[in-house]
Regions:
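C-terminal catalytic "cap/lid" subdomain
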Residues: 1-276
Length: 276
C-alpha cells in the first residue's frame, strides 16, 4: 500500500486501503455495505486500493486470485471498464511463444476460446489466463468493457486510455443489454450456493430464449441440498450442466413439495436469476 501511496501522492491523489474477504460478497447486505464504503471514498476523491485480507480469510473461501477480486469489484461498482494486466499482450490465437501467433484484438459474446487458452500461471500471481478469460467474459456480459493487456509494457495504462486503437491488447465487447445491480451480485455468487435446482428440457429451452422467464416448480425435476429462502442455488439443466445461479424464493422443503406442479409461485424469480 505504501507503494501506491507514494505513486498517487506524486499527483496529489489520496488513496485508502480496503481489505475484504470473499465472505463479504456472500450476502446482499455485506455486498452493499462494501459498495457504499467505496462509493463514499470515491465521492471524496480517495482512490480505493482493494486487496484480500489474507490474515483472516478462510482458505476454502479465498479468492481464486486478484483477477476474480477485480471482476467482483468492477461489477459491484458498476465500472465503465476493467483492465486486467498480465505478462503477455492479451489472448493469442495460438501459443504466445509461437512467432506466428497473433493477439486477438476483439472478442465478441459467445466466441469459443477454449483452444486458445494456456493453463500456465502468470508470473504476477496465482492466477492464469484461463481465470482471466472467465472473469473477463462474465464481467463483459454485465455490460462492462474488459481489456487484457501486458503490465510489463511501459505506460500501458496511459496508452490504453489515450491510444486505445493502436495499443496492443485484447478487448472483450460488453453486452449492450443493461444488467441490474442484483443480478450482478448473483452472477458472482456461485461459490456460495447452498443447493441445486435441476430443470427439465422445456425449462432449459425457455431460459435461453428471449423471454423473461422465472424458474417454476413445473419445470423442476430434482432439488439437491438443504437451503433457506433467499439462499443462492445453482441451476442445473436436464443434461447435468450448470447453467446459472439464482436466489431462492422458498426453502428446499417447499421447493420439493411444489416440484413438478402447475400453478405454483416461482422457486427463483427472473429478477433474481442469472443464466450464464
Amino acid at each position: 500500500i505504501n507503494r501506491y501511496y507514494e505513486l498517487f501522492r506524486e499527483h496529489g491523489i489520496p488513496v485508502g486501503q480496503v481489505l475484504t474477504m470473499k465472505e463479504n460478497f456472500a450476502t446482499r447486505r455485506h455486498y452493499l455495505n462494501q459498495k457504499n464504503c467505496m462509493t463514499v471514498m470515491l465521492e471524496n476523491g480517495v482512490i480505493p486500493i482493494v486487496n484480500e485480507n489474507d490474515t483472516i480469510s478462510v482458505s476454502e473461501l479465498m479468492f481464486t486470485d486478484n483477477d476474480e477480486l477485480s471482476g467482483l469489484i468492477a461489477s459491484m461498482m458498476d465500472a465503465q471498464a476493467l483492465i486486467i494486466l498480465s505478462n503477455i499482450d492479451g489472448i493469442y490465437n495460438g501459443s504466445p511463444a509461437d512467432p506466428a501467433s497473433e493477439v486477438i484484438r476483439e472478442i465478441g459474446q459467445g466466441k469459443d476460446l477454449s483452444s486458445y487458452i494456456q493453463t500456465s500461471k502468470s508470473s504476477f500471481g496465482r492466477g492464469g489466463m484461463l481465470t482471466k478469460t472467465n472473469i473477463a467474459r462474465k464481467v463483459a456480459d454485465e455490460g462492462i468493457t474488459v481489456i487484457i493487456a501486458n503490465g510489463k509494457r511501459d505506460n500501458i495504462l496511459v496508452d490504453l486510455i489515450q491510444h486505445p486503437e493502436s495499443t496492443l491488447c485484447t478487448r472483450f465487447t460488453p453486452s449492450p443489454e443493461p444488467v441490474s445491480s442484483v443480478k450482478k451480485w448473483i452472477a458472482h455468487s456461485e461459490g456460495f450456493a447452498k443447493g441445486e435446482l435441476h430443470i427439465n428440457y422445456c425449462a432449459t429451452e425457455l431460459l435461453f430464449s428471449d423471454k423473461a422467464v422465472s424458474i417454476l416448480p413445473v419445470g423442476i425435476i430434482d432439488v439437491i441440498g438443504e437451503f433457506e429462502k433467499d439462499d443462492i442455488v445453482r441451476i442445473i439443466d436436464f443434461g447435468g450442466k450448470p447453467i446459472g445461479v439464482g436466489k431462492a424464493n422458498c426453502d428446499s422443503t417447499q421447493a420439493r413439495e411444489a416440484m413438478g406442479k402447475h400453478g405454483k409461485k416461482p422457486v427463483v424469480h427472473y429478477d433474481y436469476l442469472y443464466i450464464e
